[in-house]
UniProtKB/Swiss-Prot annotation:
EC number: 2.7.7.23, 2.3.1.157
NCBIfam families named in the record: glmU, PRK14354.1
Gene Ontology CC terms, in alphabetical order: cytoplasm; membrane
UniProt: acetyl-CoA binding residues: A379, N385, Y386, S404, A422, R439
GO terms, molecular function: glucosamine-1-phosphate N-acetyltransferase activity; magnesium ion binding; UDP-N-acetylglucosamine diphosphorylase activity
Ranges where the record places region Pyrophosphorylase: 1-229
Annotated localization: Cytoplasm
Protein's name according to its UniProt entry: Bifunctional protein GlmU
Keywords, ordered alphabetically: Acyltransferase, Cell shape, Cell wall biogenesis/degradation, Cytoplasm, Magnesium, Metal-binding, Multifunctional enzyme, Nucleotidyltransferase, Peptidoglycan synthesis, Repeat, Transferase
Residue ranges of the region described as Linker: 230-250
Subunit structure: Homotrimer.
Biological process per Gene Ontology, one example term: cell morphogenesis
Organism field: Streptococcus pneumoniae (strain JJA)
Pfam families: Hexapep_2, NTP_transferase
Length: 459
């Protein structure tokens, strides 16, 4: 039989105090909704239907082309949300997972186990439950002496005995699909909230003597539903621990994993060393034996093997093998650094390609440049690429030596093996093998300093 999935993502999330739909708030680099969608993939659903509502267009954009969508224009409860999927799923034979889009910590393994449990026990409905020493506020799972599920009782309706139950409802379920939609026709809004509850379906199945079961999560953290910023931070913390643990098991060294922030899609090779307060975001890839020191921040970038990045920022760029960057360097988007390049302290590179073995040791700006191999930038070199309206390109050939405190005004080209004298302002192309000097001639006026106030003779 087929599996189907319904993801509930229509809510506004008032307690988040945000214009962004709740399910689009991010945990470890991707939205909560994407986390749930990826985990749902473990059950290989034939159809996945996502119920949208508040700012539906934003939610649909995130999963465009990956799921079918239905709209819940009025948020009238979880049962009502599932009703919205009727045109797509009613009458199909199979098992349907119903899950909230604000549960980013649920794993694919747990959802697969839930489905298997449901099928193996021939249940018409199976509740995903968890156990906690502090069940206050959760619906409790009431079982009989044979451990069969009798009902779900909410906190406000629970007896003193029922309040002692530690098994709680996580809000995730599996149903026989055909029976689900038959039962939905019989639920109503006769409750304090005036809403249709999916839990009422469980009651209907019990009344008709059909088999209802419960599968208990091994890890309570997976049950977390995010309703406010506090829970969002908790989810981020748990996810970060999971991610860092995975990398450590796979051969990555962390000085302080609790103070290291790595997004879920980051890839890290063997023998990488990561110090505290390192952040790796987006689609970043780190090559083997690279060292990332305290304070390094890398976004959507590829760093090769054996690199050393010291307290620096790299954004949307590629860094080849053996490169050293920092401290206090900034590699801005659309830059590429060739093998063995050295970018030192207080150097900024923007939108530039730099050939292998090139060095910019300190206090340099390289913007909109095409730089060859074995180039040396002296301290204080500035490539001037912007005239207030347009940006221009500088081309620097191989084996060029740029003296300290030089200003290179684009558009300009420095030929192979050329040399720029220290303190020069370069406004014209420099031919290959030439020396360019663009500075005022030094004039010494003998004894002139004796006329000035600072001279000891005038004190």
């Amino acid at each position: 039989m087929s599996n189907f999935a319904i993801i509930l993502a229509a809510g506004k999330g008032t307690r988040m105090k945000s214009d962004l739909p709740k399910v689009l708030h991010k945990v470890a680099g991707i939205s909560m909704l994407e986390h749930v969608f990826r985990s749902v993939g473990a059950i290989q659903p034939e159809k996945t239907v996502t119920v949208v509502g508040h700012k539906a267009e934003l939610v649909e954009e995130v999963l465009a082309g990956q799921t079918e969508f239905v709209t819940q224009s009025e948020q009238l409860g979880t049962g009502h949300a599932v009703m919205m999927t009727e045109p797509i799923l009613e009458g199909l034979s199979g098992h349907t997972l119903v899950i909230a889009g604000d549960t980013p910590l649920i794993t694919g393994e747990s959802l697969k186990n839930l489905i298997d449990f449901h099928i193996n026990h021939k249940n018409v409905a199976t509740i995903l439950t968890a156990e906690t020493d502090n069940p206050f506020g959760y619906g409790r799972i009431v079982r009989n002496d044979n451990a069969e599920v009798l009902r779900i009782v909410e906190q406000k309706d629970a007896t003193d005995f029922e309040k002692q139950i530690k098994e709680i409802n996580t809000g995730t379920y599996v149903f026989d699909n055909e029976r689900l939609f038959e039962a939905l026709k019989n639920i109503n809004t006769n409750n304090a909230q005036g809403e249709y509850y999916i839990t009422d379906v469980i009651g209907i199945f019990r009344e008709t003597g059909e088999k209802v079961g419960a599968y208990t999560l091994k890890d309570f953290d997976e049950s977390l539903g995010v309703n406010d910023r506090v829970a969002l931070a908790t989810a981020e913390s748990v996810m970060r621990r999971r991610i860092n643990h995975k990398h450590m098991v796979n051969g990555v060294s962390f000085v302080n994993p609790e103070a290291t922030y790595i997004d879920i899609d980051v890839e890290i090779a063997l023998e990488v060393q990561i110090e505290a307060n390192v952040t790796l975001k987006g689609q970043t890839k780190i090559g083997a034996e690279t060292v990332l020191t305290n304070g390094t921040y890398v976004v959507d970038s590829t760093i090769g093997a054996g690199a050393v990045i010291t307290n620096s920022m790299i954004e949307e760029s590629s860094v080849a093998d053996g490169v050293t960057v920092g401290p206090y360097a900034h590699i801005r988007p659309n830059s590429s650094l060739g093998a063995q390049v050295h970018i030192g302290n207080f150097v900024e590179v923007k939108g530039s390609s730099i050939g292998e073995n090139t060095k910019a040791g300190h206090l340099t700006y390289i913007g909109n440049c095409e730089v060859g191999s074995n180039v040396n930038f002296g301290a204080g070199t500035i490539t001037v690429n912007y005239d207030g309206k347009n940006k221009y390109k500088t081309v620097i050939g191989d084996n060029v030596f740029v003296g300290s405190n030089s200003t290179i005004i684009a558009p300009v080209e420095l030929g192979d093996n050329s040399l720029v004298g220290a303190g020069s302002t370069i406004t014209k192309d420099v031919p290959a093998d030439a020396i360019a000097i663009g500075r005022g001639r030094q004039i010494n006026k003998d004894e002139y300093a004796t006329r000035l106030p600072h001279h000891p003779k005038n004190q």
